[in-house]
Amino acid sequence: MAVPFVEDWDLVQTLGEGAYGEVQLAVNRRTEEAVAVKIVDMKRAADCPENIKKEICINKMLNHENVVKFYGHRREGATQYLFLEYCSGGELFDRIEPDIGMPEPEAQRFFQQLIAGVVYLHSMGITHRDLKPENLLLDERDNLKISDFGLATVFKHNGRERLLNKMCGTLPYVAPELLRRPEFRAEPVDVWACGVVLTAMLAGELPWDQPSDSCQEYSDWKERKTYLAPWRKIDSAPLALLHKILTENPTARITIPDIKKDRWYCRPLKKGTKRGRVSSGGVTESPGALPKHIRSDTDFSPVKSALGEDKASYSTSQPEPGTGGALWDSSTGSIDRLVQGISFSQPACPEHMLLNSQLLGTPGSSQSPWQRLVRRMTRFFTKLDADGSYRSLRDVCEKMGYGWKQSCTNQVTISTTDRRNNKLIFKVNLLEMESRILVDFRLSKGDGLEFKRHFLKIKGKLSDVVSTQKVWLPPP
Protein backbone atom coordinates (compact mmCIF):
# COMPACT_ATOMS: atom_id res chain seq x y z
CA MET A 1 0.00 0.00 0.00
CA ALA A 2 1.60 3.22 -1.18
CA VAL A 3 0.84 6.60 0.39
CA PRO A 4 0.70 9.71 -1.85
CA PHE A 5 3.45 12.18 -0.98
CA VAL A 6 3.90 14.70 -3.78
CA GLU A 7 2.27 14.65 -7.22
CA ASP A 8 3.22 11.33 -8.90
CA TRP A 9 5.32 10.27 -5.89
CA ASP A 10 4.38 7.71 -3.22
CA LEU A 11 6.07 6.83 0.05
CA VAL A 12 6.34 3.04 -0.08
CA GLN A 13 8.73 1.89 2.65
CA THR A 14 10.40 3.00 5.87
CA LEU A 15 14.17 2.65 5.56
CA GLY A 16 15.25 3.86 9.00
CA GLU A 17 14.57 6.13 11.95
CA GLY A 18 16.39 7.88 14.77
CA ALA A 19 16.04 10.74 17.27
CA TYR A 20 14.66 13.48 15.03
CA GLY A 21 12.95 11.82 12.09
CA GLU A 22 12.89 8.92 9.69
CA VAL A 23 13.94 7.90 6.21
CA GLN A 24 11.29 6.88 3.71
CA LEU A 25 11.56 5.43 0.22
CA ALA A 26 9.70 7.54 -2.35
CA VAL A 27 8.81 6.03 -5.73
CA ASN A 28 7.46 7.85 -8.78
CA ARG A 29 4.40 5.92 -9.96
CA ARG A 30 4.81 7.20 -13.52
CA THR A 31 8.58 6.98 -14.14
CA GLU A 32 9.33 4.35 -11.43
CA GLU A 33 12.29 6.37 -10.14
CA ALA A 34 13.20 5.93 -6.46
CA VAL A 35 14.57 8.43 -3.94
CA ALA A 36 15.32 8.20 -0.22
CA VAL A 37 13.61 10.98 1.74
CA LYS A 38 15.05 11.96 5.10
CA ILE A 39 12.22 13.55 7.08
CA VAL A 40 13.35 15.66 10.04
CA ASP A 41 10.91 17.00 12.62
CA MET A 42 12.43 20.40 13.37
CA LYS A 43 10.41 20.63 16.60
CA ARG A 44 12.27 17.59 17.89
CA ALA A 45 15.51 19.07 16.59
CA ALA A 46 14.82 22.46 18.19
CA ASP A 47 17.98 22.20 20.31
CA CYS A 48 20.22 21.76 17.25
CA PRO A 49 18.70 23.43 14.16
CA GLU A 50 22.15 24.60 13.08
CA ASN A 51 23.27 20.97 12.83
CA ILE A 52 20.53 20.27 10.28
CA LYS A 53 21.51 23.36 8.29
CA LYS A 54 25.15 22.28 8.36
CA GLU A 55 24.24 18.77 7.21
CA ILE A 56 22.37 20.24 4.24
CA CYS A 57 25.23 22.60 3.37
CA ILE A 58 27.78 19.77 3.49
CA ASN A 59 25.57 17.50 1.37
CA LYS A 60 25.31 20.25 -1.24
CA MET A 61 29.10 20.36 -1.54
CA LEU A 62 29.54 16.68 -2.34
CA ASN A 63 29.50 14.77 -5.61
CA HIS A 64 31.44 11.49 -5.71
CA GLU A 65 30.76 7.90 -6.73
CA ASN A 66 31.45 6.64 -3.18
CA VAL A 67 29.27 9.24 -1.44
CA VAL A 68 25.47 9.13 -1.32
CA LYS A 69 24.17 11.74 -3.75
CA PHE A 70 22.13 14.69 -2.49
CA TYR A 71 19.30 15.86 -4.76
CA GLY A 72 18.01 18.77 -2.70
CA HIS A 73 15.94 19.75 0.31
CA ARG A 74 12.64 21.43 1.14
CA ARG A 75 11.15 22.91 4.29
CA GLU A 76 7.41 22.43 4.80
CA GLY A 77 6.23 23.96 8.07
CA ALA A 78 8.11 22.30 10.93
CA THR A 79 9.35 19.46 8.70
CA GLN A 80 12.60 19.45 6.75
CA TYR A 81 12.87 17.04 3.81
CA LEU A 82 16.24 15.92 2.45
CA PHE A 83 16.17 14.03 -0.87
CA LEU A 84 18.95 11.49 -1.28
CA GLU A 85 20.17 8.71 -3.53
CA TYR A 86 18.52 5.36 -2.77
CA CYS A 87 20.88 2.43 -2.22
CA SER A 88 19.12 -0.87 -2.85
CA GLY A 89 22.03 -2.95 -1.53
CA GLY A 90 21.34 -1.99 2.08
CA GLU A 91 23.91 -1.38 4.82
CA LEU A 92 27.43 -2.77 4.87
CA PHE A 93 26.90 -4.46 8.23
CA ASP A 94 24.38 -6.83 6.63
CA ARG A 95 27.23 -8.34 4.58
CA ILE A 96 29.32 -9.03 7.69
CA GLU A 97 28.75 -12.44 9.27
CA PRO A 98 28.97 -12.07 13.07
CA ASP A 99 32.25 -13.49 14.43
CA ILE A 100 33.29 -14.53 10.91
CA GLY A 101 33.36 -11.43 8.73
CA MET A 102 33.37 -11.67 4.94
CA PRO A 103 35.73 -13.04 2.27
CA GLU A 104 38.98 -11.08 2.27
CA PRO A 105 38.73 -9.97 -1.40
CA GLU A 106 35.27 -8.55 -0.68
CA ALA A 107 36.56 -6.69 2.37
CA GLN A 108 39.47 -5.36 0.33
CA ARG A 109 37.19 -3.98 -2.38
CA PHE A 110 34.84 -2.31 0.11
CA PHE A 111 37.84 -0.89 1.97
CA GLN A 112 39.28 0.54 -1.25
CA GLN A 113 35.95 2.20 -1.99
CA LEU A 114 35.73 3.54 1.56
CA ILE A 115 39.20 5.04 1.25
CA ALA A 116 38.27 6.56 -2.14
CA GLY A 117 35.26 8.24 -0.54
CA VAL A 118 37.25 9.51 2.44
CA VAL A 119 39.99 10.87 0.15
CA TYR A 120 37.31 12.87 -1.66
CA LEU A 121 35.75 14.18 1.56
CA HIS A 122 39.12 15.30 2.88
CA SER A 123 39.92 16.97 -0.45
CA MET A 124 36.74 19.01 0.06
CA GLY A 125 37.81 19.91 3.60
CA ILE A 126 35.11 17.67 5.13
CA THR A 127 35.55 15.13 7.92
CA HIS A 128 32.75 12.61 8.47
CA ARG A 129 33.44 11.79 12.16
CA ASP A 130 31.08 8.80 12.31
CA LEU A 131 32.32 6.22 9.82
CA LYS A 132 30.91 2.79 10.67
CA PRO A 133 29.16 -0.05 8.78
CA GLU A 134 25.73 1.37 9.63
CA ASN A 135 26.65 4.55 7.73
CA LEU A 136 28.12 2.76 4.73
CA LEU A 137 25.54 1.79 2.12
CA LEU A 138 25.68 -0.38 -0.99
CA ASP A 139 24.11 0.40 -4.34
CA GLU A 140 22.59 -2.07 -6.82
CA ARG A 141 26.09 -2.99 -8.05
CA ASP A 142 27.42 -3.48 -4.50
CA ASN A 143 29.39 -0.24 -4.61
CA LEU A 144 30.01 1.35 -1.23
CA LYS A 145 28.57 4.81 -0.52
CA ILE A 146 29.32 6.95 2.53
CA SER A 147 26.10 8.30 4.05
CA ASP A 148 24.74 10.31 6.99
CA PHE A 149 26.61 13.59 7.36
CA GLY A 150 24.83 14.61 10.56
CA LEU A 151 28.12 14.75 12.50
CA ALA A 152 30.32 15.90 9.63
CA THR A 153 32.09 19.25 9.74
CA VAL A 154 34.47 21.44 7.75
CA PHE A 155 38.06 21.20 8.98
CA LYS A 156 39.85 22.90 6.09
CA HIS A 157 38.98 26.00 4.08
CA ASN A 158 41.09 27.84 1.56
CA GLY A 159 44.03 25.65 2.49
CA ARG A 160 43.84 26.49 6.20
CA GLU A 161 43.23 23.58 8.57
CA ARG A 162 41.63 23.94 11.98
CA LEU A 163 41.88 21.56 14.91
CA LEU A 164 38.72 19.94 16.23
CA ASN A 165 37.65 19.80 19.87
CA LYS A 166 34.23 18.14 19.87
CA MET A 167 34.02 14.53 20.96
CA CYS A 168 31.46 12.82 18.76
CA GLY A 169 30.98 9.55 16.96
CA THR A 170 30.44 5.96 18.09
CA LEU A 171 32.77 4.78 20.86
CA PRO A 172 34.15 1.57 19.31
CA TYR A 173 35.08 3.55 16.17
CA VAL A 174 36.42 6.80 17.67
CA ALA A 175 40.16 7.47 17.70
CA PRO A 176 41.91 7.48 21.11
CA GLU A 177 42.89 11.15 20.85
CA LEU A 178 39.20 12.12 21.06
CA LEU A 179 39.12 10.68 24.57
CA ARG A 180 42.39 12.24 25.71
CA ARG A 181 43.15 15.52 23.99
CA PRO A 182 41.38 18.89 24.04
CA GLU A 183 42.15 19.34 20.34
CA PHE A 184 43.02 16.97 17.51
CA ARG A 185 43.42 16.80 13.74
CA ALA A 186 40.47 15.62 11.65
CA GLU A 187 42.05 13.37 9.03
CA PRO A 188 43.70 10.85 11.40
CA VAL A 189 40.34 10.42 13.17
CA ASP A 190 38.62 9.25 9.97
CA VAL A 191 41.61 7.04 9.11
CA TRP A 192 41.30 5.31 12.50
CA ALA A 193 37.59 4.66 11.95
CA CYS A 194 38.37 3.10 8.56
CA GLY A 195 40.70 0.68 10.36
CA VAL A 196 37.98 -0.39 12.78
CA VAL A 197 35.57 -0.91 9.86
CA LEU A 198 38.18 -3.07 8.13
CA THR A 199 38.62 -5.11 11.32
CA ALA A 200 34.87 -5.70 11.49
CA MET A 201 34.75 -6.80 7.84
CA LEU A 202 37.63 -9.26 8.25
CA ALA A 203 36.79 -10.67 11.70
CA GLY A 204 33.05 -10.18 12.14
CA GLU A 205 33.47 -8.36 15.43
CA LEU A 206 34.61 -5.04 16.81
CA PRO A 207 38.06 -4.99 18.43
CA TRP A 208 37.07 -3.10 21.61
CA ASP A 209 34.37 -1.16 23.39
CA GLN A 210 36.49 1.99 23.26
CA PRO A 211 40.17 2.79 22.65
CA SER A 212 41.15 3.56 26.24
CA ASP A 213 43.43 1.95 28.80
CA SER A 214 40.36 1.00 30.84
CA CYS A 215 39.42 -1.42 28.04
CA GLN A 216 41.31 -4.72 28.28
CA GLU A 217 40.93 -5.52 24.58
CA TYR A 218 42.51 -2.21 23.63
CA SER A 219 45.37 -2.73 26.07
CA ASP A 220 45.95 -6.17 24.56
CA TRP A 221 46.12 -4.61 21.09
CA LYS A 222 48.69 -2.07 22.20
CA GLU A 223 50.75 -4.94 23.63
CA ARG A 224 50.49 -6.66 20.22
CA LYS A 225 48.68 -9.73 21.55
CA THR A 226 47.51 -10.66 18.07
CA TYR A 227 47.03 -14.29 19.08
CA LEU A 228 43.76 -13.12 20.65
CA ALA A 229 40.45 -12.44 18.88
CA PRO A 230 39.72 -10.69 16.62
CA TRP A 231 43.30 -10.42 15.34
CA ARG A 232 43.97 -14.15 15.14
CA LYS A 233 41.23 -14.39 12.49
CA ILE A 234 42.94 -11.87 10.20
CA ASP A 235 45.62 -12.77 7.64
CA SER A 236 49.11 -11.35 8.17
CA ALA A 237 49.02 -8.89 5.24
CA PRO A 238 45.87 -6.96 6.23
CA LEU A 239 46.89 -7.27 9.88
CA ALA A 240 50.15 -5.48 9.07
CA LEU A 241 48.13 -2.63 7.57
CA LEU A 242 45.87 -2.52 10.62
CA HIS A 243 48.93 -2.13 12.85
CA LYS A 244 49.76 1.03 10.91
CA ILE A 245 46.21 2.39 10.93
CA LEU A 246 45.31 1.61 14.54
CA THR A 247 48.38 3.37 15.92
CA GLU A 248 47.57 5.31 19.07
CA ASN A 249 49.72 8.34 18.32
CA PRO A 250 47.94 10.26 15.52
CA THR A 251 51.21 11.79 14.30
CA ALA A 252 52.63 8.28 13.79
CA ARG A 253 49.44 6.89 12.27
CA ILE A 254 49.61 5.97 8.60
CA THR A 255 48.19 8.55 6.19
CA ILE A 256 45.82 7.78 3.35
CA PRO A 257 48.47 8.28 0.62
CA ASP A 258 50.57 5.61 2.36
CA ILE A 259 47.55 3.32 2.83
CA LYS A 260 47.11 3.40 -0.94
CA LYS A 261 50.71 2.21 -1.33
CA ASP A 262 50.29 -0.66 1.15
CA ARG A 263 51.09 -4.15 -0.14
CA TRP A 264 47.73 -5.65 0.86
CA TYR A 265 45.73 -2.65 -0.33
CA CYS A 266 47.36 -2.85 -3.76
CA ARG A 267 47.13 -6.63 -4.09
CA PRO A 268 45.05 -7.57 -7.17
CA LEU A 269 41.62 -8.92 -6.32
CA LYS A 270 41.23 -12.66 -6.63
CA LYS A 271 39.30 -13.85 -9.64
CA GLY A 272 35.67 -14.74 -9.24
CA THR A 273 34.98 -12.45 -6.28
CA LYS A 274 32.85 -9.93 -8.14
CA ARG A 275 31.01 -9.28 -11.36
CA GLY A 276 32.09 -6.66 -13.84
CA ARG A 277 35.22 -4.57 -13.48
CA VAL A 278 36.40 -1.96 -11.01
CA SER A 279 36.88 1.63 -12.09
CA SER A 280 39.76 3.83 -10.95
CA GLY A 281 37.74 4.86 -7.93
CA GLY A 282 37.07 1.26 -6.95
CA VAL A 283 33.52 1.26 -8.29
CA THR A 284 32.22 -1.92 -9.89
CA GLU A 285 30.89 -1.42 -13.39
CA SER A 286 28.67 -4.41 -14.02
CA PRO A 287 28.07 -5.54 -17.59
CA GLY A 288 24.60 -5.69 -19.04
CA ALA A 289 21.54 -3.56 -18.53
CA LEU A 290 20.43 -2.76 -15.01
CA PRO A 291 16.88 -1.87 -14.01
CA LYS A 292 16.66 1.87 -13.55
CA HIS A 293 13.25 2.13 -11.96
CA ILE A 294 11.04 0.71 -9.23
CA ARG A 295 7.30 0.20 -9.51
CA SER A 296 4.98 1.45 -6.80
CA ASP A 297 1.60 0.01 -7.82
CA THR A 298 1.76 -3.49 -6.35
CA ASP A 299 -1.29 -4.23 -4.22
CA PHE A 300 -0.31 -5.26 -0.72
CA SER A 301 -2.42 -5.88 2.34
CA PRO A 302 -0.52 -6.22 5.61
CA VAL A 303 -1.09 -9.17 7.88
CA LYS A 304 -4.05 -8.31 10.12
CA SER A 305 -5.31 -11.52 11.66
CA ALA A 306 -2.39 -11.97 14.01
CA LEU A 307 -1.76 -8.43 15.19
CA GLY A 308 -5.17 -6.77 15.10
CA GLU A 309 -5.79 -3.09 14.35
CA ASP A 310 -3.33 -0.20 14.57
CA LYS A 311 -3.00 1.07 18.11
CA ALA A 312 0.50 2.41 18.62
CA SER A 313 1.81 5.92 18.23
CA TYR A 314 4.87 6.75 16.14
CA SER A 315 7.85 8.85 16.92
CA THR A 316 9.84 10.37 14.10
CA SER A 317 13.53 10.52 14.65
CA GLN A 318 16.76 11.40 12.98
CA PRO A 319 17.38 8.69 10.42
CA GLU A 320 19.77 5.98 11.32
CA PRO A 321 21.97 4.94 8.42
CA GLY A 322 20.02 3.30 5.70
CA THR A 323 19.52 5.54 2.68
CA GLY A 324 21.11 6.13 -0.68
CA GLY A 325 21.94 4.76 -4.28
CA ALA A 326 20.52 6.37 -7.44
CA LEU A 327 19.76 4.67 -10.73
CA TRP A 328 19.08 7.69 -12.91
CA ASP A 329 20.20 11.17 -13.90
CA SER A 330 19.31 13.53 -11.05
CA SER A 331 18.53 16.29 -13.52
CA THR A 332 15.24 14.64 -14.48
CA GLY A 333 12.21 16.84 -14.06
CA SER A 334 10.32 14.35 -11.90
CA ILE A 335 12.96 14.51 -9.16
CA ASP A 336 13.04 18.29 -9.43
CA ARG A 337 9.29 18.32 -8.85
CA LEU A 338 9.71 16.01 -5.87
CA VAL A 339 12.25 18.38 -4.31
CA GLN A 340 10.11 21.45 -5.03
CA GLY A 341 7.02 19.68 -3.73
CA ILE A 342 3.36 20.59 -4.07
CA SER A 343 1.27 18.77 -1.48
CA PHE A 344 2.83 16.68 1.26
CA SER A 345 0.97 14.03 3.23
CA GLN A 346 2.33 11.77 5.93
CA PRO A 347 1.51 8.06 6.30
CA ALA A 348 -0.46 7.00 9.34
CA CYS A 349 1.57 3.84 9.64
CA PRO A 350 4.74 3.83 7.54
CA GLU A 351 5.45 0.12 7.77
CA HIS A 352 2.19 -0.65 5.97
CA MET A 353 4.02 0.50 2.89
CA LEU A 354 6.37 -2.45 2.73
CA LEU A 355 6.46 -3.80 -0.76
CA ASN A 356 4.63 -6.98 -1.67
CA SER A 357 7.13 -8.60 -4.00
CA GLN A 358 10.42 -7.03 -3.08
CA LEU A 359 12.05 -10.38 -2.40
CA LEU A 360 10.07 -12.87 -4.41
CA GLY A 361 11.65 -14.60 -7.33
CA THR A 362 13.31 -17.81 -8.31
CA PRO A 363 16.93 -18.19 -9.35
CA GLY A 364 17.22 -17.84 -13.08
CA SER A 365 13.95 -15.98 -13.50
CA SER A 366 13.87 -12.50 -14.93
CA GLN A 367 13.94 -9.95 -12.16
CA SER A 368 11.13 -7.53 -11.64
CA PRO A 369 12.08 -4.02 -10.53
CA TRP A 370 10.78 -4.91 -7.06
CA GLN A 371 13.64 -7.31 -6.61
CA ARG A 372 16.05 -4.36 -6.63
CA LEU A 373 14.65 -3.08 -3.36
CA VAL A 374 16.74 -3.29 -0.21
CA ARG A 375 18.59 -6.60 -0.06
CA ARG A 376 18.82 -7.95 3.48
CA MET A 377 19.84 -11.27 4.95
CA THR A 378 17.85 -10.78 8.16
CA ARG A 379 14.58 -12.31 6.99
CA PHE A 380 13.04 -15.75 6.55
CA PHE A 381 9.83 -17.53 5.57
CA THR A 382 7.92 -19.61 8.11
CA LYS A 383 5.93 -22.82 7.79
CA LEU A 384 3.04 -21.25 9.73
CA ASP A 385 0.21 -18.86 8.99
CA ALA A 386 0.22 -15.28 10.25
CA ASP A 387 -1.27 -16.12 13.66
CA GLY A 388 1.15 -18.97 14.26
CA SER A 389 4.16 -16.97 13.12
CA TYR A 390 3.25 -14.07 15.38
CA ARG A 391 2.70 -16.30 18.43
CA SER A 392 5.94 -18.21 17.88
CA LEU A 393 7.94 -15.01 17.52
CA ARG A 394 6.32 -13.48 20.59
CA ASP A 395 6.93 -16.58 22.72
CA VAL A 396 10.60 -16.79 21.75
CA CYS A 397 11.22 -13.11 22.39
CA GLU A 398 9.51 -13.25 25.76
CA LYS A 399 11.58 -16.29 26.77
CA MET A 400 14.74 -14.45 25.71
CA GLY A 401 13.81 -11.44 27.83
CA TYR A 402 13.30 -8.97 24.99
CA GLY A 403 11.04 -5.96 25.25
CA TRP A 404 8.07 -6.38 22.92
CA LYS A 405 5.65 -3.79 21.54
CA GLN A 406 3.12 -3.90 18.76
CA SER A 407 3.86 -0.91 16.53
CA CYS A 408 1.58 -1.46 13.54
CA THR A 409 -0.86 -3.96 12.18
CA ASN A 410 1.97 -6.01 10.71
CA GLN A 411 4.88 -4.83 12.83
CA VAL A 412 6.37 -5.30 16.27
CA THR A 413 9.25 -3.42 17.87
CA ILE A 414 11.75 -5.49 19.85
CA SER A 415 14.19 -3.92 22.31
CA THR A 416 17.10 -5.29 24.30
CA THR A 417 20.67 -4.42 25.25
CA ASP A 418 23.77 -5.67 23.48
CA ARG A 419 27.00 -7.09 24.91
CA ARG A 420 28.23 -3.56 25.63
CA ASN A 421 25.01 -2.77 27.51
CA ASN A 422 23.91 -0.38 24.77
CA LYS A 423 20.30 -0.14 23.62
CA LEU A 424 19.39 -2.27 20.61
CA ILE A 425 16.04 -1.80 18.87
CA PHE A 426 14.79 -3.55 15.76
CA LYS A 427 11.52 -3.78 13.86
CA VAL A 428 9.99 -7.06 12.76
CA ASN A 429 7.40 -7.10 9.98
CA LEU A 430 5.19 -10.07 9.14
CA LEU A 431 4.41 -9.91 5.44
CA GLU A 432 2.03 -12.20 3.58
CA MET A 433 3.46 -13.12 0.19
CA GLU A 434 1.51 -15.49 -2.00
CA SER A 435 0.15 -17.42 0.98
CA ARG A 436 3.53 -17.46 2.70
CA ILE A 437 4.60 -15.44 5.73
CA LEU A 438 7.88 -13.57 5.50
CA VAL A 439 9.37 -12.43 8.81
CA ASP A 440 11.54 -9.40 8.03
CA PHE A 441 13.91 -7.87 10.63
CA ARG A 442 15.29 -4.33 10.31
CA LEU A 443 17.71 -2.53 12.63
CA SER A 444 16.20 0.63 14.10
CA LYS A 445 18.82 1.68 16.65
CA GLY A 446 22.13 0.26 17.77
CA ASP A 447 25.10 -1.69 16.47
CA GLY A 448 24.60 -3.62 13.23
CA LEU A 449 26.75 -6.61 14.16
CA GLU A 450 24.96 -6.98 17.49
CA PHE A 451 21.64 -6.80 15.66
CA LYS A 452 22.69 -9.65 13.37
CA ARG A 453 23.80 -11.73 16.38
CA HIS A 454 20.38 -11.34 17.99
CA PHE A 455 18.64 -12.10 14.70
CA LEU A 456 20.56 -15.37 14.40
CA LYS A 457 19.70 -16.29 18.00
CA ILE A 458 16.00 -15.69 17.38
CA LYS A 459 16.10 -17.59 14.10
CA GLY A 460 17.82 -20.48 15.86
CA LYS A 461 15.12 -20.61 18.54
CA LEU A 462 12.50 -20.65 15.76
CA SER A 463 14.24 -23.41 13.79
CA ASP A 464 11.20 -25.69 14.02
CA VAL A 465 8.98 -23.18 12.22
CA VAL A 466 11.49 -21.54 9.85
CA SER A 467 10.91 -22.68 6.28
CA THR A 468 13.79 -24.30 4.44
CA GLN A 469 12.77 -22.27 1.41
CA LYS A 470 15.41 -19.62 0.90
CA VAL A 471 14.56 -15.96 0.59
CA TRP A 472 16.22 -15.47 -2.74
CA LEU A 473 18.27 -12.31 -2.99
CA PRO A 474 19.08 -11.02 -6.46
CA PRO A 475 22.80 -10.91 -7.17
CA PRO A 476 24.50 -7.50 -7.27
UniProtKB/Swiss-Prot annotation:
Gene3D superfamilies: Kinase associated domain 1, KA1 (3.30.310.80), Phosphorylase Kinase, domain 1 (3.30.200.20), Transferase(Phosphotransferase) domain 1 (1.10.510.10)
Catalytic activity annotation: L-seryl-[protein] + ATP = O-phospho-L-seryl-[protein] + ADP + H(+); L-threonyl-[protein] + ATP = O-phospho-L-threonyl-[protein] + ADP + H(+)
GO term, biological process aspect, one: signal transduction in response to DNA damage
An example molecular function term from Gene Ontology annotations: protein serine kinase activity
Localization per record: Nucleus; Chromosome; Cytoplasm; Cytoplasm, Cytoskeleton, Microtubule organizing center, Centrosome
EC number(s) on file: 2.7.11.1
Primary location recorded for the protein, binned into one broad class: nucleus
GO terms under cellular component: centrosome; chromatin; condensed nuclear chromosome; cytoplasm; nucleoplasm; nucleus
In-chain residues carrying the UniProt-annotated modification Phosphoserine: 280, 296, 317, 345
PANTHER family: MAP/MICROTUBULE AFFINITY-REGULATING KINASE, SERINE_THREONINE-PROTEIN KINASE CHK1
Protein name: Serine/threonine-protein kinase Chk1
